[in-house]
Amino acid sequence: MKKQTLRIGVGGPVGSGKTALLRSLCSAMRDYYNIAVVTNDIYTQEDAKFLTQHEALDADRILGVETGGCPHTAIREDASMNLAAIDQLLERHGALDVVFVESGGDNLSATFSPELSDFTIYVIDVSAGDKIPRKGGPGITKSDLLIINKTDLAPLVGASLDVMAHDAKIQRGDRPFIFSNLKSAQGLDEIIQIIVSEGMLEAKEIPAAKAVV
């Protein structure tokens, strides 16, 4: 029976911490799972270069897709470029356990095509204000996991984490959300646990994740 690769879509606004999250996840999981990454940028491959330069994975496990125009189209209406990139990674590395697909910076209405993503993570950050969860949108309400990142900035911007938690619960119902601060690895172990359990990956004894950003 052919092994199924778990495809995880990672979306969120520009600057919310998507690429930093991928760097952290790859660093923590790469010795235990066969992983690759596809990044999306409009006119550059900056996110792919960032991950390569910081040795999140070997360079041949990271592919950058230049979407041109609207980045939403490449993850939703026409995912062909991303699907081709995944196929290329599978040809290189055989049966991958996980492929992360990072979207270009998007808004709260962005969603991944089911053809492209089996599990979706949406990243917002505290610096945008504590009203973001209540604004809703598919990224907030429908993603499999919502990450509220950069909790260390809450006092600096006057944001209430209690308000954000309250609104996230209302918007998401039973769907999980996690507060994170990747600079201290806060929330990272819990994120990995959810990916493994919900993605039906083989459970392994992974040490506590360390901050790498």
From Swiss-Prot:
Stretches that traverse the bilayer? none
Family, according to the entry, reads as follows: Belongs to the SIMIBI class G3E GTPase family. UreG subfamily.
Q: Can you provide one Gene Ontology molecular function annotated for this UniProt record?
A: GTP binding
Q: Where in the cell is it found?
A: Cytoplasm
Its name, as the record gives it, is Urease accessory protein UreG
Signal peptide segment: none
Could you tell me which InterPro entries the record lists for this protein?
CobW/HypB/UreG_nucleotide-bd (IPR003495), P-loop_NTPase (IPR027417), UreG (IPR004400)
Among the entry's GO cellular component annotations, what is one? cytoplasm
CDD domains assigned to the protein according to its UniProt record, in alphabetical order: UreG
Q: Which residues bind GTP?
A: G12, P13, V14, G15, S16, G17, K18, T19
Per the record, the GO terms for biological process are:
urea catabolic process
UniProt-listed NCBIfam families: ureG
Please name the HAMAP family in this protein's record.
UreG
What Pfam families does its record include? cobW
